Structure formats: structure tokens, C-alpha cells
């Protein structure tokens, strides 16, 4: 699991480097098309026997997962890597809430306490001016909420579809969606506030292709290692260890030139990590 967290942070580091010259929308496209190729090969070798029947929920999982990933990649390119990863790691907190709201799962007192701690942590990191949050903070929070909604849908979808099909829905939308948006971007005037959603394709050059491959390989390796970890030990232990991603991201981000987080940001990160521990160990 530590290796999964490290490779995940490596992916984030190279995505951040690519984000200085390529739009996050394009990085999202390349990250997903790599995964689509791998999953299609796996399905060809061993066809699925899913019973299906929940197409729109499957599409929703792909669509919301794509938007969450896009928001995440955009933030990695524009704010410190450790902060972007911390926002994304709020997903277990929102997952506990959505599982209670949509699936009728119990919301124990520890989970309620975790939600409160997580909210305080978000406020300390975002430092809102009154009720106003920056675009980066809003997208960071959405990356956690969107991921949680995607995970919530998986709990229902796994009764109808092979895990590979569920993952393919996410990566397919995450490939086709950016492609459409990049084509549309050539025919519209892009509002600066929507630059995370619309961007013109920029042909990668030289070493950027190597970075793109690393992002794809690291993302796939991280997913495989995490899945393996869940089969070898208790989910609570694995879930707790995933928060080392924040530490790895802080280190890699600092190496890449990120500003070291201030006192309030560190406290906010600590509260979100503590909240995550409370949720995954409930």
C-alpha cells in the first residue's frame, strides 16, 4: 500500500510538470486513454459475464469520475501538490455521508465527528474571504466530492457489472469527454473562469511524451497495487495507509518548487488526515 501511495504521488508530480505546458484537460485525456487500452485488452482476454441493467448509473459513475479527475489535475497544475492531494483525500468523508444519504448505510458518531473535523480542515486550508472561495479551492473540494459520488455509485454498480466494466466506464468518458471539449474549444471564446473545462489541444513535444507515459503507467500501477493491498489485509488498515499520499505529495511538491505550507494549512491537513482515520476505522 505504501508503494501504491508513492506511485500515486509520482503520477501527481509528473502531472504537475506536464501542467506547466499542457492543459489539464489534455493530461486527463492521455491518462485515461492509456487505461482504456489496458482494460480493453484484459476484457478481450477474459470477457465479462456482467448481468448489466444499470446503464445510466454506469454513465453517471464515468461522468462524475471524469469531472472529479479533471478538477484534480487542474489543481495539481496550479496549487501546491500536497494541498491538491489533501483536498482529493476528503473523498472518504463525503463517501460516508453519501452512503448514508443514498444507500441507507449507518452514519456513526465517529463519522459525524470526522465530517466536522474535515470541514474545519478544509476551512483552514482554503482560508475563505468571508463566504468566498478561490476557483482552486472550489475545484479541490469538488475533486473530493466527485470522487465520493463515484465511489458511492460503485457500491451499487458492483452488483451488476464486472469491476473492469465499471472502471472502463470512467476511463472511456474520461477519454471521449476531453476529446470533445478540446475540439469544441477551437470554435468558442474560452471564458478564463472555465479554463479547467475548455482548452485547445497542444501537441506534446520531446520529453513530454515520456512524462505522459509515466503518468499513465504510474496511475495504472497505483490502482493495481491498491487493489492488491485490499485483497491482502483489512480495508481499514489499507485506507489509513493511503493517507501517506499526502506526505509523499508534500515531499515531491517541495522538490518541484512548491511553497512549504503555512501553519494553518498544516493544521488543516492534519485534521483531514485525522478525520480520514476516523472514517476508515469505523
Residue ranges, per PLM feature:
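Structural signature of hydrophobic alpha-helical transmembrane segments
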Residues: 20-35, 73-91, 133-146, 204-217, ...
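Transmembrane alpha-helical segments that form core, pore/gating elements
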Residues: 13-16, 24, 39, 132-193, ...
Amino acid at each position: 500500500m505504501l508503494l501504491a501511495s508513492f506511485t500515486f504521488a509520482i503520477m501527481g508530480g509528473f502531472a504537475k510538470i506536464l501542467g506547466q505546458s499542457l492543459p489539464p484537460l489534455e493530461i486527463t485525456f492521455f491518462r485515461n486513454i492509456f487505461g482504456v487500452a489496458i482494460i480493453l485488452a484484459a476484457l478481450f482476454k477474459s470477457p465479462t459475464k456482467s448481468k448489466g441493467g444499470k446503464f445510466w448509473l454506469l454513465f453517471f459513475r464515468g461522468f462524475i469520475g471524469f469531472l472529479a479527475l479533471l478538477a484534480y489535475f487542474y489543481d495539481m497544475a496550479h496549487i501546491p501538490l500536497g494541498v491538491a492531494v489533501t483536498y482529493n483525500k476528503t473523498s472518504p468523508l463525503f463517501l460516508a455521508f453519501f452512503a448514508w444519504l443514498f444507500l441507507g448505510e449507518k452514519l456513526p458518531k465517529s463519522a459525524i465527528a470526522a465530517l466536522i473535523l474535515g470541514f474545519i480542515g478544509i476551512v483552514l486550508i482554503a482560508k475563505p474571504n468571508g463566504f468566498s472561495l478561490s476557483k482552486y479551492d472550489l475545484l479541490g473540494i469538488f475533486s473530493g466530492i466527485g470522487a465520493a459520488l463515484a465511489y458511492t455509485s460503485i457500491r451499487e454498480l458492483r452488483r451488476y457489472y464486472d469491476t473492469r466494466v465499471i472502471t472502463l466506464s470512467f476511463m472511456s468518458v474520461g477519454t471521449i469527454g476531453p476529446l470533445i471539449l478540446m475540439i469544441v474549444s477551437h470554435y468558442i471564446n474560452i471564458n478564463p473562469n472555465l479554463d479547467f473545462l475548455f482548452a485547445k489541444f497542444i501537441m506534446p513535444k520531446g520529453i513530454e511524451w515520456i512524462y505522459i507515459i509515466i503518468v499513465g503507467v504510474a496511475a495504472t500501477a497505483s490502482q493495481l497495487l491498491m487493489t492488491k493491498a485490499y485483497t491482502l489485509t483489512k480495508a481499514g488498515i489499507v485506507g489509513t495507509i493511503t493517507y501517506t499520499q499526502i506526505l509523499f505529495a508534500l515531499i515531491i511538491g517541495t522538490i518541484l518548487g512548491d511553497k512549504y505550507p503555512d501553519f494553518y494549512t498544516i493544521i488543516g491537513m492534519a485534521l483531514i488526515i485525522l478525520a480520514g482515520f476516523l472514517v476508515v476505522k469505523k
